[in-house]
Amino acid sequence: MDTFSTKSLALQAQKKLLSKMASKAVVAVLVDDTSSEVLDELYRATREFTRSRKEAQKMLKNLVKVALKLGLLLRGDQLGGEELALLRRFRHRARCLAMTAVSFHQVDFTFDRRVLAAGLLECRDLLHQAVGPHLTAKSHGRINHVFGHLADCDFLAALYGPAEPYRSHLRRICEGLGRMLDEGSL
């Protein structure tokens, strides 16, 4: 029995094409201004923390690739009911996590890196479960790389610490997250 499917082939081609195009120019076309500002600040904070432009670019590129592939899966109706339910849980958890991150920034002495790290790792696990068989091992590795960096307690401590330039990066990230929460785009 031949299991060839044009729809499946087209989806694979789109994923492959998008994985090659995950650059800042493509992000500018596909991402709204607020999201772009948040991603730019996240890139700057990551570059500052890792002291590596290459590592910061890799992390952001992986984030964009995963987001684009997730969008393709949704647009192509590739996810089943259980997977969509997991994705709704992921979105709800990510939204709650964004509110927590903003709150930690706004209210002095409330920051707890363990809370943010645990929430980020929970989001990672939900995303893995939701997209399980639809993405390659390499894409799952990208998910691990992005969430591993974001949940790094040392990175979170630096980001929420009093020192510049992290304080400025965090302020701009939280301002953007606040706008995204208000607009309902997160």
Curated annotation (Swiss-Prot):
Keywords from the UniProt entry: Cytoplasm
Expression by tissue: High expression detected in most carcinoma cell lines, especially in cells transformed with virus genomes.
Subcellular location: Cytoplasm
InterPro entries: TNFAIP8-like, TNFAIP8_sf
Keyword Zinc: no
Keyword Cytoplasm appears in the UniProt entry: yes
GO cellular component, one term: cytoplasm
GO biological process terms held by the UniProt record: negative regulation of TOR signaling; regulation of apoptotic process
GO MF entries: identical protein binding
Induction description: Up-regulated by oxidative stress (OS) at both transcriptional and translational levels.
Entry-linked Pfam families: DUF758 (PF05527)
Membrane-spanning residues: none
Source organism superkingdom: Eukaryota
Subunit relationships: Interacts with FBXW5; TNFAIP8L1 competes with TSC2 to bind FBXW5 increasing TSC2 stability by preventing its ubiquitination.
UniProt family annotation: Belongs to the TNFAIP8 family.
Role played: Acts as a negative regulator of mTOR activity.
Protein name, per record: Tumor necrosis factor alpha-induced protein 8-like protein 1
Species of origin: Homo sapiens
Native organism taxonomy: Eukaryota, Metazoa, Chordata, Craniata, Vertebrata
